[in-house]
Amino acid sequence: MARTVQCVYLGKEAEGLDFQLYPGELGKRIFDTISKEAWGEWQKKQTMLINEKKLNMMNMDHRKLLEEQMQLFLFEGKDVQIEGYVPPKPE
């Protein structure tokens, strides 16, 4: 049986993550309150951020920026803003 969580991002009960994907207290908070679906949405945004801003995960400043954006996205509902990105128009 799948583990469920009250997802703060989706605002509803949904299937939870299978294991803690992020270290520390923040990782525990994500595991306890973020669903697989919400984590998948974050991963798409994270990929865009890394690519568009040319972030280097070996750089601590870049890692800090990504973590801040992750918290804003998952827990405060703020979308990731990428300068110059225009989403494709639906067909």
UniProtKB/Swiss-Prot annotation:
Superkingdom: Bacteria
GO cellular component: cytosol
GO molecular-function terms, A-Z: iron ion binding
Keyword match Lipid biosynthesis: no
Gene Ontology biological-process entries: cellular response to oxidative stress
Entry keywords, A to Z: Iron
Signal peptide as annotated in the record: none
Job of this protein: Could be a mediator in iron transactions between iron acquisition and iron-requiring processes, such as synthesis and/or repair of Fe-S clusters in biosynthetic enzymes.
Family under the similarity heading: Belongs to the Fe(2+)-trafficking protein family.
Alphabetical list of PANTHER family matching this protein: FE(2+)-TRAFFICKING PROTEIN-RELATED
Official protein name in the record: Probable Fe(2+)-trafficking protein
Organism: Shewanella amazonensis (strain ATCC BAA-1098 / SB2B)
